[in-house]
Amino acid sequence: EGVMNFMNTGDIRKLPNIDTSFSAVALDINEIDVDSLSFPFCTECMVIGEDIPRDKLSQTIKPLGDSIVIAGSKHRAKVHIHTDDPATLFETLATYGEVQQQKVDDMREQNKSVRSQQKIALVVDSTCDLPVDLLEKHHIHVVPVRLNFGKEQYIDRVTISNEEFYTKLAHSAHHPQTSQPPPADFRRMYQFLSSHYESVISLHLPQVLSGTYQNASAALEKVKFKQHQTILDSLSVSAGTGVIALELAEAIDQDMSFPELTQLAEETIEKTEIFIALKTLDAVQKGGRLSVGKKRLIDFLGLNLVLSITRNGLLKPCGVTFGRKNIFEKFKKFVLKKAHNKSIKRIGIVHGVNPDTAETMKVVFESAYPDAQVFVSDFCPALGVHAGVGAIGIALQYN
């Protein structure tokens, strides 16, 4: 049942004490027009190598941004820069050594928080699949998951796009691995939000699938909001977490109280289901979640597993369809049967570079449930590691 564990855990190695202090003066985003910045991403990392030429390194990255500060030693250099392309920056720095402790903050998003009139912040991790326009519209704050191909480290949806991820998934010699955001990432997010919001709700992957919930909880214990703060287990993944987040975000927009929000969250989680169909089991097998023998047997029998989240937060098969032809047509009928005679408020459809199938599903479900809000999004890279190319997920939120 290795396929049931969605996320791997990981720890950042402790670094020896070195002088990595920056003399630069931080920008006050309250006093500048952040939207007009040419280089909106405040980016930091550690470069570990042999005899790192810091002056040359500085000149190399100069065209990529401004506010450059490099500190440390010849073997460990900490880099700070404001850039518009963190991915290219990290790729460039990798020519000087191993890039670790990547950190990227979007100053435009921080500025929106400063200007927001809301009193309650909503935080999710990047496994919550929602279209970017909905995340921005409802001021939903995202802490990204980490992933790596061998020694190449990436920040989910920040330093690797979906297109880049799936290209690497198909061609890299290394099958990617994921790790939950470290507590420091959550703590930095919470500390910033505590200066601009009275309360926070942080919604994450099931505790039994990932250490994300635990890391978020550990970080929040060290930050104090003026009114209320809580971590919620979504008991869902991907678009399932997405529809729950949307319900809470709309309630926050309507100034619902914190106790009412937590009650609403419990009810919404109970009313949410997600179903996932994999085009192939290749990613599952390569990731060590399914033995070669079991994969061969499933393929030989022509079985298509349909996965879902149990009430305990476990990802398990909830059914099968038969025959390798028209997999997603059969999956569509499976989900429609599950939803038969039920009143549906929201439907989230996600895909792993399978947009045509996702759009076809959208048309079908909009026709079947004309009163429901329907959205389409990509499977984030952190989940694409396990779902693989072509996967389709459908989340249903019942009234």
Which residues fall in each region the model found?
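Mixed-charge interfacial surface used for oligomerization/domain docking
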Residues: E1-R76, Q110, V114-Q117, T127, ...
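Helix N-cap motif at beta-to-alpha junctions
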Residues: E50-D51, T83-A87
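Short amphipathic alpha-helices in soluble, non-transmembrane regions
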Residues: K56-P63, L89-G97
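Conserved short beta-strand edge segments in small beta-sheet-based binding/regulatory domains
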Residues: I70-G72, A94-N111
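A generic structural motif
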Residues: H75-D84
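N-terminal glycine-rich anion-binding loop in soluble enzyme alpha/beta folds
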Residues: A121-D185
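Short beta-strand segments
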Residues: V124, S202-P206, D233, A395
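Active-site cofactor/cluster-binding pocket
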Residues: P181-A216, L220, K224
